[in-house]
Amino acid sequence: MKNVLKIIMALSLTTMLTSCGISFGVDSRRSSNWSSDSSSSLTSEEVNLSEDISDINKITMKIDVSDLNVIYHDGSNVEITGELSSYSKGVDINKSGSTFEIVEETTQSMNLGPNNYSELLIKIPRSFNGDLKLDFGVGSFNVSDLVLNNVEVKAGVGDVSLDGISFNSLDLESGVGSVSLVTKEKTGDIYISGGVGEVNVELGDINGNLKFDGGVGSADIKVPVDAPININSKSGLGDSNIKAKTSNEGKYTFDLEVGLGSVTVRN
C-alpha cells in the first residue's frame, strides 16, 4: 500500500512541479506573444563582452535559455563569450552601484529545444570574492572553482553543477533536473530545496549548518569522516539512510527532510 501511495504522489508532484512555469522559467509559454511558428528569420550570432568590475561586490545573472559555464580567470574584467541561439534577444550588462548584472533573454517560441540553447562562457576575475546570484530558466549551469561570499541559485529546467567552490552561505532552489555540489575547501551554511531530480552533495571542510528539503528524487550527501555535525532527519513518504561516521562534537546541524524519494548520508 505504501509503494502504491508513493507512486501516486510521485505522479501528482511531478505533474504539479513541471507545470509551474513561474518557478521553472517556462511561464513565457503562456504569454500572448508566444509563437508556434516553425520558421524563424533570426540567425545565431557570437557574443563577446568585457567590463571592468573592480568596484563591484555582487554579480547577478538572469539567464533565460542557455547552457552556461562560469569560471575564474586572471584578467581584471568580466568576460562574456559564446554563441547566441537564433531565438536569443542578446546579452545585456548593467552596473548599478556595487552590483553588476548580466541578462540573457530569449524570444518566446514553441520550437525551443536543446539545439536552440545559447552557449555562454562567463569568466570572472580571480580577485572577485563577493556575492553571486543566479536566476536560471532553461538549460544547464556549471560553476567551477570559485571562492565567493553569499551564493544564491534559483534553477528552472536543467542540470546544475557547482564544482570545487567555496562560500560563506549557499541558498539553492532546484527545479527539474539534477543538482551536483562538490566543495573542497571552507563552506558555510547551506540550504538546498529539492525539486524533481537527483541531488548529489560532496562536502570538504564543513564550517556551517545544512538544511535540505527534499523534493521528488534521491539525494546522496557525502561528508568527511568524523565531521563535527549532528544529523536530524524527518521522513514523509521517503526514506533516510544515515550511515556516516561523525564526531561527538556536533558543532553544526544537518536538518534533512525527505520528500518523495530517499536521502543517504555517508562518508
What are the roles of these predicted feature ranges?
Residues 90-110:
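Mid-chain, structured segments of secreted extracytoplasmic proteins
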Residues 46-49, 164-165, 169-173, 178-267:
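Short, surface-exposed interaction patches in beta-rich subdomains
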Residues 7-13:
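Sec-dependent N-terminal signal peptides
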Residues 61, 91-93, 256:
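A structural signal for short hydrophobic beta-strand segments in well-ordered beta-sheet cores
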